[in-house]
Swiss-Prot record:
One of its GO terms (cellular component) is cytosol. GO terms for molecular function: 14-3-3 protein binding; enzyme inhibitor activity; myosin phosphatase regulator activity; phosphatase regulator activity; phosphoprotein phosphatase activity; protein kinase binding. It comes from Rattus norvegicus (Rat). The gene is Ppp1r12a. It is found in: Cytoplasm; Cytoplasm, Cytoskeleton, Stress fiber. This is Protein phosphatase 1 regulatory subunit 12A. Phosphorylated on upon DNA damage, probably by ATM or ATR. Phosphorylated by CIT (Rho-associated kinase). Phosphorylated cooperatively by ROCK1 and CDC42BP on Thr-697. In vitro, phosphorylation of Ser-696 by PKA and PKG appears to prevent phosphorylation of the inhibitory site Thr-697, probably mediated by PRKG1. May be phosphorylated at Thr-697 by DMPK; may inhibit the myosin phosphatase activity. Phosphorylated at Ser-473 by CDK1 during mitosis, creating docking sites for the POLO box domains of PLK1. Subsequently, PLK1 binds and phosphorylates PPP1R12A.
Length: 1032
């Protein structure tokens, strides 16, 4: 039964399993591919830092915020100023970047340029309206942090020119906070707005900056002395952290809770500056006395005030009055208890007053900057989050403008909205001192709260804050902020508070630390700089200013601030995935933000970037292709058939520009027509010989042209002499010679036209070299050949190859020598008979190849001195050849153009040369007989000279090469020697180290050996004693 039950249960389990969720799960867990997406702003900042203006433009067109700030509050303009990228600075300013945008520590781009010493950027920024009186969270203007004299001079001149009051700018924050605190006190209602990110209040700012007057007024107005920010810091935490003794005393006198802990579990003692720890302990003792006295008196009013909240309108006044009285009594008791401490305090106050006069001035402007910044933050975040809560008409939109422009009547510098601003807005300003801790940066946690919640709180407070305060009473919160900031500034030096990151990073000496802590180190989010706000109002930059906060002088910023400071851009970036639309895809794709549809943007990015790169490469290739094409044109390999040569050329350079193919097509037209009587086998043999004797990359140089012309002259003179001797020997054939001459003269008339084509044919012989040129069967029209020849010559002359004309000259000389050969051949043919003349002429024409000169490796030999001189002349320089050339030309009454004009006059020269060469043997051979010997001697001497010069040049070149090689060899040897020495030293050191280790091992063995020796000695002594005993 039990077995049956078990089986039944098992079957039921199996049935339940089938179709269950677990059964339906796939056996292999599918892992989703992680896709990395970057925020639009991060992509924009990266593009700006890389200097890619095209990419930046595309991002801007796609809706990127040009004033986007990273977690440190740094915008692209800040980064460009730090990187000394003048072009990007100009580009960003031209595209609407806020030139006075502060970062988390109140540094505007001008601060960055001044601290780095970039004069050109500073001049440009000033010219574009940068505020030279801008004060950062430490109370420093660009002039204060300028590194170089030239920069200081520039900024000082600009300050003088604009009439900026630096001291007033520094005190602006405290003055505004005082005004608002008085206004709250008079109105009986505190309408402070917490800072959007830190949750700081005006009381925090006043305590941290040491604005004692503001602090007193705020407490009188009914501020809760134990109010906490988002990180749980009370005003006492701030005052203790920044070392503000007076602020601590005021808070303790007003019975703040000294044991309150923040969210990290730290009391004010834990985060306090080391310098005031003792003072805080004394204050705690006094407060305990006060508490005991009050417990004795059982004063309910004081107890109620201790827990009083900000928004109690009626009770606040009653309790406030008693509060004012009680603290004074308590203060008198405390002072009576410690007169010594009072004296010290007074001295400290004097010191602080001297310092804090400056510090307060700095902090005023800083806290103003904080209020202004934080208020815009709230309003901006409201705008960004599209919160449609209906605030009072005076409160809703004016928050930005009023926050920026509330300087009221006392502020004469900023004539914008003064007393007209609604009290709610002004109070909000003062409340924005909540930003007090933007600069304080205690723990990274304070930046965690979203700006949206802060903005909602701000709006709620705006809606609830209905009390209108008179413009005459300045805000309390501003003065509070100043004092709080002083306290916070001092706290920077606290090194032992582990979880808190000291706000001030660069304290040097104690005095500096005190001053800086009191005024400068507090990085307030410039919620109180109304002056800044008005300037920024004018530049429509309130949003960005609201989002940024100040930092210490260094540009290194903390990341917890970074997280909270940047205003998130809510624009979703549409991505284009198709690679076709290059610009659009570029605009959309490069920055794949978290808001883009997943998967689409990466593809768009790749395609767009690849398109752009492809376009750039193609343009570069187009630039380079023209010379490439020309180069290929000059010396293609010699192909046997005309058609195959053109096709091969076009196919090999298919990737280059179409112009190259066009030129190749043109070249097809200059190829010498194949004669009918020449068989295919003969043509192949000729092309094969041409390929053997010529390098595929060989060109034609000017030197070769000149050599060819001299060679023509020499070969012509030798041939004329031989022909004259033959005529003398064969007088019986003079009639036939005359007939032949007459035929030649008749053909000369037609040749005058054909010689214009002659050069083009000789040029093309560089590609089909050994194919004999039939002047009569040339079918190419002279005009077309001339035009194509001109273009081809131009293309070849553009080449960079030094020997680009070798083929032309050799072919040129070969063409002229062929004419002379033909004349001699025809005379010989006349001897043998006219019936055999045609085939014999072909053979004869083919045989005198040994007299022709190839441009490549010459493979024929002859014993005559003339041909040897011709071979020597291949290496001669161009200068003396020019002389011989002009001589030989002028001898034939042709226009003697210098060889330097060869490129211009080459076409005409070729025709005149060949024509004169043709006529010379027939017309004036006998007349020139006497002069040819002298010419030959002269040419021989010139050839020798040129040969010697060439040899000298070659030897000089070899000498320089050898010297270079020698130097390289010596350097190599030295390096090798050094290396060998080093290696030898290393080997020796290793050997010594081994030796030392061996010796150490031996030393370790030495005690053992000594012990063994001692033992053996003892044994020997014992044995000796035993033996002596036995011997007895």
């Amino acid at each position: 039964m039990k077995m049956a039950d078990a089986k039944q249960k098992r079957n039921e389990q199996l049935k339940r399993w089938i179709g269950s969720e677990t059964d339906l799960e796939p056996p292999v867990v599918k892992r989703q591919k992680t896709k990395v997406k970057f925020d639009d702003g991060a992509v924009f900042l990266a593009a700006c830092s890389s200097g890619d203006t095209d990419e930046v433009l595309k991002l801007l067109h796609r809706g990127a915020d040009i004033n986007y700030a990273n977690v440190d509050g740094l915008t692209a303009l800040h980064q460009a100023c730090i990187d000394d990228n003048v072009d990007m600075v100009k580009f960003l300013v031209e595209n609407g970047a806020n030139i006075n945008q502060p970062d988390n520590e109140g540094w505007i781009p001008l601060h960055a340029a001044a601290s780095c010493g970039y004069l050109d950027i500073a001049e440009f920024l000033i010219g574009q309206g940068a505020h030279v009186g801008a004060v950062n969270s430490e109370g420093d203007t660009p002039l204060d942090i300028a590194e170089e004299e030239a920069m200081e001079e520039l900024l000082q001149n600009e300050v003088n020119r604009q009439g900026v009051d630096i001291e007033a700018a520094r005190k602006e924050e405290e003055r505004i906070m005082l005004r608002d605190a008085r206004q709250w006190l008079n109105s009986g209602h505190i309408s402070d707005v917490r800072h959007a990110k830190s949750g700081g209040t005006a009381l925090h700012v006043a305590a941290a900056k040491g604005y004692t007057e503001v602090l007193k007024l705020l407490i009188q107005a009914g501020y809760d002395v134990n109010i906490k920010d988002y990180d749980g810091w009370t005003p006492l935490h701030a005052a203790a952290h920044w070392g503000k003794e007076e602020a601590c005393r005021i808070l303790v006198d007003n019975l703040c809770d000294m044991e309150t802990v923040n969210k990290v579990g730290q009391t004010a003692f834990d985060v306090a500056d080391e310098d005031i720890l003792g003072y805080l302990e004394e204050l705690q003792k006094k407060q305990n006395l006060l508490h005991s006295e009050k417990r004795d008196k059982k004063s309910p009013l004081i107890e109620s005030t201790a827990n009083m909240e900000n928004n109690q309108p009626q009770k606040t006044f009653k309790n406030k009055e008693t509060l004012i009285i009680e603290p004074e009594k308590n203060a008198s008791r405390i002072e009576s208890l410690e007169q010594e401490k009072a004296d010290e305090e007074e001295e400290g106050k004097k010191d602080e007053s001297s310092c804090s006069s400056e510090e307060d001035e700095e902090d005023d402007s800083e806290s103003e900057a904080e209020t202004d910044k934080t208020k815009p933050m709230a309003s901006v975040t409201n705008a960004h989050t599209a919160s449609t809560q209906a605030a009072p008409a005076a409160v809703t939109t004016p928050t930005l403008s009023s926050n920026q422009g509330t300087p009221t009547s006392p502020v004469k510098k900023f004539p914008t909205s003064t007393t007209k601003i609604s009290p709610k807005e002004e109070e909000r300003k003062d409340e924005s001192p909540a930003s007090w801790r933007l600069g304080l940066r205690k723990t990274g946690s304070y930046g965690a709260l979203a700006e949206i919640t802060a903005s909602k709180e701000a709006q709620k407070e705006k809606d609830t804050a209905g009390v209108i305060r008179s413009a005459s009473s300045p805000r309390l919160s501003s003065s509070l902020d100043n004092k709080e900031k002083e306290k916070d500034n001092k706290g920077t030096r606290l090194a032992y508070v582990a979880p808190t990151i000291p706000r001030r990073l660069g304290s040097t000496s104690d005095i500096e630390e005190k001053e800086n802590r009191e005024s400068s180190n507090l990085r307030t989010s410039s919620s109180y700089t109304r002056r800044k706000w008005e300037d920024d109002l004018k530049k429509n930059s309130s949003i960005n200013e609201g989002s940024t906060y100040h930092r210490s002088c260094s540009f290194g910023r903390r990341q917890d601030d970074l997280i909270s400071c940047s205003v998130p851009s809510t624009t979703s970036t549409p991505t284009v995935t198709s690679a076709a639309g290059l610009q659009k895809s570029f605009l959309s794709s490069t920055s794949t933000t978290a808001k883009t549809p997943p998967g689409s943007s990466p593809a768009g990015t790749q395609s767009s970037t690849s398109n752009r790169l492809w376009a750039e490469d193609s343009t570069e290739k187009e630039k380079d292709s023209a010379p490439t094409a020309a180069t290929i044109l000059v010396a293609p390999t010699v192909v046997s058939a005309a058609a195959s040569s053109t096709t091969a050329l076009t196919t090999t350079t298919a990737g280059t520009l179409s112009s190259t193919s066009e030129v190749r097509e043109r070249r097809r037209s200059y190829l010498t027509p194949v004669r009918d009587e020449e068989s295919e086998s003969q043509r192949k043999a000729r092309s094969r010989q041409a390929r053997q004797s010529r390098r595929s990359t060989q060109g034609v140089t000017l030197t070769d042209l000149q050599e060819a012309e001299k060679t023509i002259g020499r070969s012509r003179s030798t041939r004329t002499r031989e022909q004259e001797n033959e005529e003398k020997d064969k007088e019986e054939k003079e009639k036939q010679d005359k007939e032949k001459q007459e035929e030649k003269k008749e053909s000369e008339v037609s040749r005058e036209d054909e010689y214009k084509q002659k050069y083009s044919r000789t040029y093309d012989e560089t590609y089909a070299r050994y194919r004999p040129v039939s002047t009569s069967s040339s079918s190419t029209p002279s005009s077309s050949s001339l035009s194509t020849l001109g273009s081809s010559l131009y293309a070849s002359s553009q080449l960079n190859r030094p020997n680009s004309l070798v083929g032309i000259t050799s072919a040129y000389s070969r063409g002229l020598t062929k004419d002379n050969e033909r004349e001699g051949e025809k005379k010989e043919e006349e001897k043998e008979g006219e019936d055999k003349s045609q085939p014999k002429s072909i053979r004869e024409r083919r045989r005198p190849r040994e007299k022709r000169r190839s441009t490549g490796v010459s493979f024929w030999t002859q014993d005559s001195d003339e041909n040897e001189q011709e071979r020597q002349s291949d290496t001669e320089d161009g200068s003396s050849k020019r002389d011989t050339q002009t001589d030989s030309v002028s001898r034939y009454d042709s226009s003697s153009t210098s060889s330097s004009d060869r490129y211009d006059s080459l076409l005409g020269r070729s025709a005149s040369y060949s024509y004169l060469e043709e006529r010379k043997p027939y017309g004036s051979r006998l007349e020139k007989d006497d002069s040819t010997d002298f010419k030959k001697l002269y040419e021989q001497i010139l050839a020798e000279n040129e040969k010697l010069k060439a040899q000298l040049h070659d030897t000089n070149m070899e000498l320089t090469d050898l010297k270079l090689q020698l130097e390289k060899a010596t350097q190599r040897q030295e390096r090798f020697a050094d290396r060998s020495l080093l290696e030898m030293e290393k080997r020796e050191r290793r050997a010594l180290e081994r030796r030392i280790s061996e010796m150490e091992e031996e030393l370790k063995m030495l005690p053992d050996l000594k012990a063994d020796n001692q033992r053996l000695k003892d044994e020997n002594g014992a044995l000796i004693r035993v033996i002596s005993k036995l011997s007895k």
